[in-house]
Amino acid sequence: QDYSENNNSTATLCLGHHAVPNGTIVKTITDDQIEVTNATELVQSSSTGKICNNPHRILDGRDCTLIDALLGDPHCDVFQDETWDLYVERSSAFSNCYPYDVSDYASLRSLVASSGTLEFLTEGFTWTGVTQNGGSNACKRGPASGFFSRLNWLTKSGSTYPVLNVTMPNNDNFDKLYVWGVHHPSTNQEQTDLYVQASGRVTVSTRRSQQTIIPNIGSRPWVRGQSGRISIYWTIVKPGDVLVINSNGNLIAPRGYFKMRTGKSSIMRSDAPIDTCISECVTPNGSIPNDKPFQNVNKITYGACLKYVKQSTLKLATGMRNVPEKQTRGLFGAIAGFIENGWEGMIDGWYGFRHQNSEGTGQAADLKSTQAAIDQINGKLNRVIEKKNEKFHQIEKEFSEVEGRIQDLEKYVEDTKIDLWSYNAELLVALENQHTIDLTDSEMNKLFEKTRRQLRENAEDMGNGCFKIYHKCDNACIESIRNGTYDHDIYRDEALNNRFQIKGVELKSGYKNWILWISFAISCFLLCVVLLGFIMWAYQRGNIRCNICI
């Protein structure tokens, strides 16, 4: 007879935590795969597929690179004096003017991009004895031959090209960027036809720097009908400094300067469409939400962005260890506590009670312990997000071929940083997951110990997270245990009396079992004695003979 279930003078009270049929696998310090009831993804692994134009000012470069817009390529005239937070260069961008190359292209591109403006101011350079505003069929502006709008191609006047010596002081309180060039003719005949001298020379200097360029005459691959080239150079003139230009031929002169600004603007190569929306973080793949601490979309970012990590997923446990409920004998047919398994269907709390008494069965959540666990887990999640969601952007890194070793070093440094961030992120999440599981287990144990202290000798720990209560405990009594108002003194005498009676019955049942076992053993012994006696009697009568052969 099972007194814990059938005797109206007793009751069973179990403590447990909620469970779900299919939990989420997370990593901890001690276990790579542990199932929890709930987890939050910390890695943003997808973008919106479009670049949001708010709050950042996005300038769509369309078919113009930033350098083409800077020089004034005819098809980029719409970008004159433009400003931006982020200049988006498209893969479809192309040059449509005289073929050129840029000395230290990446540095100039980065400098102009960070300035965030193409604001240009014309200055009154005096070029005496030469013809200005040269053009080329390779650079048409409308039906006529043209040239870069920010540059002035100087050629001979009549049959002379005098030595040019021009100075331009910087009397303002900001840096000025001057862009100039040197023309490399394809033949000696072209050289003399344009500049008279068989070999020209261009020297541009300030108090801090000097560059002297001698043209390289020779044929090159044809581009837009030209085998000559223009080399573009640039010089920054600080406030109080002076720009000096000296040349006897081949000079592509500046028309003025670009006003340099110190800012956090940038440039990005992307083919993602630009749309009207709001996002703090932009990647070449598109804008991404900013509500997680890590992202795996792209290393290159602009704005208040998430840290890039290698992992495509990092799950932070926001629930307890999941132990699905065993349903072999029904919900209460096999009432059991948290030591055996969790409870499914607890929708109003994480921890709770199940009871079985003379009035039937029931279940209720313990809101206090549930709220304590939730508050600590939410605080942990917020701390992780705040700790890792630093506002920064990672610009593109470019280097020319001669800077290959620098590029390799830069790539190594960036890869190492990403490796460290990825390792730190994984370690942080594993540590926090371990703490969360320990924390939720601790809250369960606290509730169990609190209940044990209330019941004292009035109940017995059944070893599975349940208590056998040795007195009649109706629903009001069960509720007093749950809310902490249970008075064990009221039920002590009844509990002691019932305990002795139940233990006595269990003891008698135990004696009966022992007597049965002893009787069975004696019967077996007597049967063996009778069988042995029969064998001895038959042997003496000669009915049984035993031969031993060696």
From Swiss-Prot:
Full protein name: Hemagglutinin
Post-translational modification: Palmitoylated. In natural infection, inactive HA is matured into HA1 and HA2 outside the cell by one or more trypsin-like, arginine-specific endoprotease secreted by the bronchial epithelial cells. One identified protease that may be involved in this process is secreted in lungs by club cells.
Gene: HA
GO molecular function: host cell surface receptor binding
Mode of membrane association: Single-pass type I membrane protein
Subunit note: Homotrimer of disulfide-linked HA1-HA2.
Species of origin: Influenza A virus (strain A/Duck/Hokkaido/21/1982 H3N8)
Site (Cleavage): R329, G330
Location of this chain's protein in the cell: Virion membrane; Host apical cell membrane
Membrane-crossing residue ranges in chain numbering: 515-535
